[in-house]
Amino acid sequence: VSRGLGDVYKRQATEIAKIAHEMPEYAHAVVLADDSGLEIDYLNKEPGIYSARYMGEDTSYDIKNQALLDRLDGVPDEKRTARFVCAIAAAMPDGCCEVVRGTMEGIIGHKIAGENGFGYDPIFFLPECGCTSSELSPEKKNELSHRGEGLKKIRKILEQR
């Protein structure tokens, strides 16, 4: 299932990059686009590709986060595994499109914690760090995050072109 969702992230990022690249002002530029989401294994990869629209686009992340915590109430840590997934597409001036995928593995914590993040960061717990993604410094989060991993991969590809 995760592989299929990963392919959807890649397809959506690629489509966005290609559409933007067709605009005259970007025709001779490298255009980057991304699609990302939170996959919770116990919830069959929800909210997944619908992460931004989960429970409705106008629903605050405070409410979304609490709803996910409520759904996982009583679920042991070993079954709370989750990951942030990011696909980054680079549409090139020659029409070629490169796509990479980055992930950050963790678990869904038991409470909302931290002030440095956004979205689902306050419930995404990193056991190796002993804190949520929202409790990391911005520098540490960039080093560990799914987007950071994806950007490192796409940068390497761009430097080789």
Question: Each PLM stretch: what is its role?
Answer:
Residues A27-R80, G117, P122-K152:
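Active-site-adjacent loop/tail segments of enzyme domains
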Residues K10-E25, N44-K45:
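Phosphate-binding chemistry for phosphorylated carbohydrates and sugar-nucleotides
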Residues G95-P122:
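Catalytic beta-strand/loop module used to bind and position nucleotide/cofactor moieties
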Residues A17-A20, L68, I154:
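Hydrophobic alpha-helical packing residues
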Residues K79, R83-M92, G102:
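A glycine-rich beta-turn/hairpin centered on an aromatic-Pro dipeptide
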Residues K153-R161:
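C-terminal alpha-helix
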Residues V1-Y9:
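Single conserved hydrophobic/aromatic residue that forms the stacking wall/gate
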